[in-house]
Each structure stands twice: as C-alpha cells, then as structure tokens.
Regions:
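A generic "binding-loop/recognition-motif" signal
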Residues: 102-103, 126
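HTH-adjacent hinge/linker in prokaryotic transcriptional regulators
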Residues: 1-102, 108-116, 120, 131-135
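Conserved phosphate- and dinucleotide-binding cores of soluble alpha/beta proteins
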Residues: 2-27, 32, 47, 125-259
C-alpha cells in the first residue's frame, strides 16, 4: 500500500467516525480520485474489519458482535430505559415473542407483576427471568443453543417459530440503519428474525446509540419493516426523522431517574 493510499484510508475512517456513513462518489470528489480507487479502499478497510461495505459506500461495523454474556453486562442503565419503553407496547392477554438480546431481557424486568400474557422465546435467560412473573404463560422454544447468541438456533427452532403468529415481537437487533436496514452477525439468527418479521402483527426493536447507522453481514429486512423503533433519549434527531419518513413509529426511552 502506498503512503498516499494509507493516508487516504485513514481520512476515510475519520469521516466514517464523524459522519456515521461514507459514500464512494463523495469520497472520490473530496480526494480527487476515481470511484474505483475509493471502492478498492473500502474493500481493503472492510477486509480488515474496519468498516462494512454497503451499496454506494460504507457504514461502521456494529459493536454488537460480542458474546451474550459480555453484552448482558454492558450499558445496563441504558438498556433498562429501553426495556421500560418496550414493555409499554405490550397488549395484555396476547401472544408476545421475545427475541434474544440483553435489551429484551431488561424489558422483562419492567413487566408489571400482574401482567397477564403468553410469551414465547428461544432465549433461556429471558425464559428464566419470566419465571418470576406469575401471570405469564411461558413457551420456551427449543433447539441447539448457541452460546454466543445466547439462544436456540437451527431448523427445529425456526420451524417452531414459523408456527406462531405473535401479536407483538420484540426483535433483538445487532445493527440498524434507516437506509441499509436491519442486520445480524449470524445467518441462522438472521433467519429467525426474518420469520418474526413475516409472522408477527407488530414488530418493535429497541437500540442503543452505538448500534445505529451501523451494519452487519446478514440482512434481515428494511427499516420500514419495523412498526416501532425505540431510541435512546439523546439519539440523533436526523436519524429519528429518517425512520419516521419510512413509516416507522419512533419512540424515545426516558432515562432512568437518579436515586
């Protein structure tokens, strides 16, 4: 790699960190070079895990590729606020599907103790937390449990989920962008999430700021396939408008009050 190319790629990364996305055409104009050269730069950066290529440019890589155990201990107060907002969408006496994810686990803690509900999940940690909710009827979807995802995956799991018609699905999201859509890091996890999009009357996803305007390898659906997106209180207004322009209802989680 020439010094010029190395410097250009560093500046591309700086723009990506500042703006949340880069477009090949704009970069070519800014650096007075060809789009082919920029595309080669983006391929090289993506190959080193420094960005994720999308049509026309690149997005940052989502930070959500760590294990379920690690994710459960991160940003707990912020996830609690998102979980509270998710819990407010639930219709009593309905079928709710809870996808895997530490933010969805936080939502369980926000359920009122007297909430009457049937909940299906393939996430053992969520199922264990639901046992404390005496008015909840729990359906645990089985299959091979993937330790990194923290949930059952595979053909048996998918078949059982395909047979359900939830009134609401709380989707666990690895990466979300208004243009690039919803994405995941595991192909089997992505297939389960696609089934939830197809079969649920309503779908909601709550997302931390650092997962916004990022991408992951396996596309689940377009942003407009989500009925609700719950953002943090300080999430970008422009991102919120971009989701709303696509017909998605945008809610903001209220931060937890300090003791």
């Amino acid at each position: 790699m020439s010094i010029l190319a190395a410097e250009r790629q560093q500046r591309i990364l700086e723009r990506l960190g500042r703006d949340g996305r880069v477009l090949a055409a704009s970069l070519a104009e800014a650096f007075a070079t060809s789009e082919d050269t920029i595309r080669r730069d983006l391929r090289d950066l993506a190959g080193r895990g420094l960005c994720r290529r999308v049509y026309g440019g690149a997005l940052p890589v989502s930070p959500a590729s760590s294990s379920a155990q690690i994710r459960a201990g991160e940003a707990t107060d912020r996830k609690a606020a998102l979980g509270q907002a998710l819990a407010g969408l639930i219709t009593p006496d309905s079928l709710l599907f809870m996808d895997s994810g530490s933010t969805n686990l936080a939502a369980v803690k926000a359920f009122p103790d007297d909430l009457r509900l049937t909940v299906a999940t393939h996430d053992p940690a969520i199922a264990a937390a639901l046992l404390a909710k005496r008015q909840v009827t729990l359906w645990l979807i089985g299959g091979r449990v993937d330790a990194r995802i923290g949930a059952a995956l595979g053909g048996r799991t998918l078949a059982d989920i395909e047979a359900l018609r939830p009134e609401l699905a709380l989707l666990g999201v690895c990466a979300l962008d208004p243009v690039a859509g919803v994405a995941a890091f595991d192909p089997e996890d992505a297939e389960i999430k696609r089934a939830l999009l197809r079969n649920s009357s309503r779908v909601a996803a709550a997302i931390l700021n650092e997962k916004l305007e990022t991408s992951a390898p396996f596309v689940i659906g377009q942003a407009e396939s989500l009925d609700y997106v719950i953002l943090e209180a300080d999430a970008s207004d422009s991102v919120a408008r971009a989701f709303a322009d696509r017909g998605t209802t945008v809610l903001r989680a209220q931060p937890a009050e300090a003791d």
